[in-house]
């Protein structure tokens, strides 16, 4: 599904083309082997039906159709991903051990903090703001480097929820690094290897549309991003 009103599928993921939080849910659904529809909306011109069911006015939403044509709307990517993990068959994305599972959830929250810094990085319009955010991101990935003890994924051979959370973060840098060398991962070889492994995962590759890179570059241009000035 592309744009407009969501259809009557059992699961519909209400999306925006660039949103990393939407990508999280799309990756988890794909890893579980769950069929779902996607409905893309323009966040600058949100339709009335979206306002009616989205308390925070944000994507993603997961519309869950129940018996009798009753539809529940789940919001917040973390909630959606946990719901999918708990209700859908397929490979488990969380560890079975409670302590290990809690540790994974901690690094998921850390990934969300990286996304917050990444927003400031990509929208920085001057050299000082850009460099401050660049250093902050490099430092956070340095923390991640220290906990990566297995390969190719966060927990070794098994793709986990943590991988689904970090894959959209790394996708940003696939575009950024095609514009200019950010050097964010210069001191983190294990993170670089993890990033490469996630890039080749089908669920990750298919979580966005083919024009993702063009859309992100257009967004950077609209924001007068300093990253583009470096490239120039």
Question: Can you say where each PLM-predicted feature lies in the sequence?
Answer:
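Conserved G/P- and acidic residue-centered "switch" motifs that form tight phosphate/ATP-binding loops
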Residues: 19, 163, 201
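GST-like domain detector, emphasizing the conserved glutathione-binding G-site
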Residues: 1-146, 152, 223-227, 231-232
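Catalytic cores of transferase enzymes with a strong primary signal for eukaryotic protein kinases
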Residues: 75, 133, 185-186, 204, ...
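Short acidic/histidine-centered micro-motifs embedded in hydrophobic/aromatic stretches
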Residues: 107-110, 121, 167, 210-214
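Short, mixed-charge aromatic SLiMs
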Residues: 107-108, 140-141, 187-203
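GST superfamily/GST-like fold recognition
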Residues: 154-179, 184-193, 197-198, 208
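Long hydrophobic alpha-helical segments typical of transmembrane helices together
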Residues: 194-232
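Hydrophobic/aromatic-lined pockets within catalytic cores
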Residues: 85-89, 112, 149, 174, ...
């Amino acid at each position: 599904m592309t744009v407009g009103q969501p259809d009557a599928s059992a699961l519909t993921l209400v999306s925006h083309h660039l949103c990393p939080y939407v990508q999280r849910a799309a990756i988890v659904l794909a890893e579980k082997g769950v069929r779902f529809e996607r409905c893309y909306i323009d966040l600058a011109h949100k339709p009335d039906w979206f306002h009616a069911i989205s308390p925070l006015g944000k994507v993603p939403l997961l519309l869950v159709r129940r018996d009798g044509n009753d539809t529940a709307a789940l919001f917040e990517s973390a909630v959606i991903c946990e719901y999918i993990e708990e209700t859908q068959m397929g490979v488990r994305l969380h560890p079975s051990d409670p302590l290990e599972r809690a540790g994974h959830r901690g690094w998921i929250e850390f990934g969300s903090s990286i996304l917050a810094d990444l927003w400031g990085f990509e929208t920085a319009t001057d050299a000082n703001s850009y460099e401050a955010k660049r250093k902050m991101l490099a430092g956070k990935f340095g923390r991640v480097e220290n906990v990566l003890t297995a390969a190719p994924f966060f927990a070794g051979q098994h793709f986990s929820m943590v991988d689904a959370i970090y894959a959209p973060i790394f996708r940003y840098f696939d575009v950024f690094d095609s514009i200019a060398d950010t050097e964010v991962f210069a001191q983190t070889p294990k993170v670089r290897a993890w990033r490469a492994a996630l890039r080749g995962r089908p669920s990750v590759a298919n979580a966005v549309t083919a024009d993702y890179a063009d859309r992100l570059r257009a967004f950077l241009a609209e924001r007068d991003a300093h990253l583009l000035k470096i490239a120039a």
